[in-house]
Structures are given as structure tokens and as C-alpha cells.
Amino acid sequence: MRLRLLVSVGVLLVALLPSPPCRALLSRGPIPGARQASQHPQPLSFFQPPPQPQEPQALPTLLRVGEEYFLRLGNLDETRAAPLSPAASPLASRSSSRLSPDKVAANFFRALLQPRRPFDSPAGPAERGTENALGSRQEAPAARKRRSQEPPISLDLTFHLLREVLEMTKADQLAQQAHNNRKLLDIAGK
């Protein structure tokens, strides 16, 4: 019992102590796989905070889209929009005017972060044009009904499966403990 406690305390200490950032992530070169000179010639101390780079680092962003969560690293505030031309498709030939996948993903997440209007509010002129292009407004309740009939996916299902696995593991541990107790009683009874 004490051994488990000591091991768990050791794991928590290692996990919660500050550590220097990975040098491979700090030194991204223009050529992937090429070695670069270290930006920080002195060795990093374990308790010393890492030196701040010249450019501000992009903080990870947790985005919620429906029931799914995405972790996005990068700047979501860029104003350049992703082109909707055939050149932007992955099957198109490579061209110099094409955006990188990171910029396309950033544009996608920025579009997801834009405020949405409620379903009951009247649509503006620009939104009416997109509604006419996508279909009439009467199809929305039918689509919502179809979606509600589908089985839950994503986080709800993940946590449900996780709970079931944990319950099965707990039941297995209890059965194993009972078996071990029976063995001990048989040995002690002899």
C-alpha cells in the first residue's frame, strides 16, 4: 500500500514540476529535418523559467464545435480568408498561390468562432441568399429531427464507453481480489 502511495506521489511530482520546453518544437527551421544552431547556448536549468522568444507564442485554443472539441495551435486572428477555388482542393496541382494547411485550418476555425444568429431570428439579405442557395428554411426542423434520432457520437459516447470500461475493470478487480482472498483462506485453513 505504501509503495503504491509513494509511486503515485512520485508520478504526480514529475508531472506537475515545471519543465523546459522541447527544443525540437522551439527551433522550427525552414527545411524540415535540417539541424539549426541552438537559440539558447546555455543549458536550461530544471527550475529556471524558459527564456521568452522574440515573437509571442501562439497559445493552444480549445474550440467546441457541436459536441466535439478541437485543440488548435496557431493564430486564429489572421484576416486572410481561405480561397474557395479548385486550386485549394487537395487533389489540385500544387501552386505557389495555395495556402498552407495551417492557414486553411485557421480560417476554418475562425469561421466557426464567428457568432451565430438564433434559428428564430429573421435572416439578413446576405443570409437569405445563402438560405435560398442551400434550400428552404422548412427543411431545418426535419434535419434537426433526423440528427436527434441518430445515436450519440463524440464526447458523450466516449465518456459512456469510458464509464463502462471502468465499471468492467472494477468488477474484474473485485473478482480477482475475491479469488486471492479464497486462496489465502485455503492456504491458512490447511
Curated annotation (Swiss-Prot):
Region Disordered: list its residue ranges: 33-57, 116-151
Where is the secretion signal located?
1-24
Q: Which UniProt keywords apply?
A: Amidation, Cleavage on pair of basic residues, Hormone, Secreted, Signal
Q: Which domain of life is it from?
A: Eukaryota
What are the coiled-coil residue ranges?
none
Spell out the InterPro entries in the cross-references. Corticotropin-releasing_fac_CS, CRF, Urocortin_CRF
**Which residues are processed away as propeptide to yield the mature protein?**
25-147
The answer to keyword Lyase applying to this record is: no
Q: Which residues carry this modification: Alanine amide?
A: A188
For this record, an example GO cellular component is: extracellular space
Any Gene Ontology biological process: negative regulation of epinephrine secretion
Q: Which terms in the Gene Ontology molecular function aspect does this entry carry? A: corticotropin-releasing hormone activity
**What protein family does this chain belong to?**
Belongs to the sauvagine/corticotropin-releasing factor/urotensin I family.
UniProt protein name: Corticoliberin
